[in-house]
């Protein structure tokens, strides 16, 4: 969660980039072919696995998106939309613009976009947003050529390679998948991939 507490630094770094984002992507945004080998291919495969679990868990938790284990923490639905927002916005660190519908002309607009996502209440629309955000993340990784992976960029105010920034994008998804699994268990929902496993699984 440390990276999301530092989100304002990302906002400042990406303030020149341009509600809910299931609308249009930039023209040509998804033209980059998916790599077949190398670190980007491995990251994309990881994102695909994460997407399957997030989507399955979001479906399984239908009707329980308002569950939260304690006051003052995000609800299950807010966590899903937090992940969606990060998938749209974190790729900006490596130069991949968020969808046009994610307002990013200023810090205020960027933060408003994040808040708007986390305040969604229509569960069907939230699941669409989540799926769209994973698509954006996959295509963002594909857009960064292997030859640029060692280029240095600013990541939350500190220098890091594009490789490290893309890895952070994926580890952030893992972090909140664990959180979402704990939320599901607390709400009495067994993660679909664990159902029938006997030992309970994740």
Tell me what each language-model feature is.
Residues 25-38:
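N-terminal pre-domain segments of enzymes
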Residues 1-6:
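Positively charged n-region of N-terminal signal peptides that target proteins for export
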């Amino acid at each position: 969660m440390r990276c999301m507490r530092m989100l304002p630094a990302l906002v400042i770094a990406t303030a020149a980039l341009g509600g809910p984002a299931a609308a249009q992507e930039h023209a040509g945004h998804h033209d980059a072919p998916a790599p077949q080998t190398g670190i980007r291919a491995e990251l994309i495969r990881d994102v695909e696995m994460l997407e399957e679990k997030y989507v399955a868990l979001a479906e399984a938790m239908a009707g329980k998106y308002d569950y939260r284990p304690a006051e003052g923490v995000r609800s299950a639905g807010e966590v899903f939309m937090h992940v969606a927002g990060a998938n749209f916005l974190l790729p900006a660190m490596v130069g991949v613009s968020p969808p046009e519908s994610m307002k990013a002309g200023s810090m205020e607009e960027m933060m408003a976009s994040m808040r708007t996502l986390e305040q969604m209440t229509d569960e069907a629309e939230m699941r669409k947003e989540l799926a769209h955000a994973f698509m954006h993340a996959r295509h963002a990784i594909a857009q960064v050529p292997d030859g640029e992976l060692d280029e240095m960029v600013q990541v939350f105010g500190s220098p890091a390679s594009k490789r490290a920034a893309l890895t952070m994008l994926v580890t952030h998804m893992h972090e909140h998948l664990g959180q979402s699994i704990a939320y599901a268990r607390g709400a009495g929902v067994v993660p679909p991939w664990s159902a029938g496993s006997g030992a309970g699984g994740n």
